[in-house]
């Protein structure tokens, strides 16, 4: 649909959306793909453990866990759901595993890709993002850039504008130039 609306399509996504942006970059041609803190694995776990974690989560019964077990339903912002299903995490990690495996054997369809990581990331695996960029670069992929959001306290959700503090405003200093540059 987007291709019919203009001559250059830029796709950007955060977390699970970042994973789907990276998947799209691997399989489809877009002008520029910007994967922001893509959910390719879990922070502090070695990337090679992701397939085993995926299998375990798929085998276990689905449960809903709190994003923050201390704040529970008081977690802000109000428009966000305070829990997540383990089955959704398993399926997202399954997409990540398939993407990483495909990237090891084939170049991405998209020639211009930016992966943005948060140096104070607490949720997703920056190591997995670096591994994916390395796989793409090993195939001589066009332009694969790694950019980093720096200077934030430990966090994952760096773009939520209603979150207390200045996370989003500070993250936008890195993100907006990348997104504005997408038109080149």
Specify the residue positions occupied by each region the protein language model found.
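A structural motif
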Residues: 56-85
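Gly/Ala-rich beta-loop-alpha elbow adjacent to hydrolase catalytic centers
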Residues: 12-21
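Residue-level signal for short, function-critical loop segments
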Residues: 15, 39, 119-121
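Conserved acidic catalytic loop of the alpha/beta-hydrolase fold
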Residues: 1-10
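Serine-hydrolase catalytic core
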Residues: 80-153, 167-180
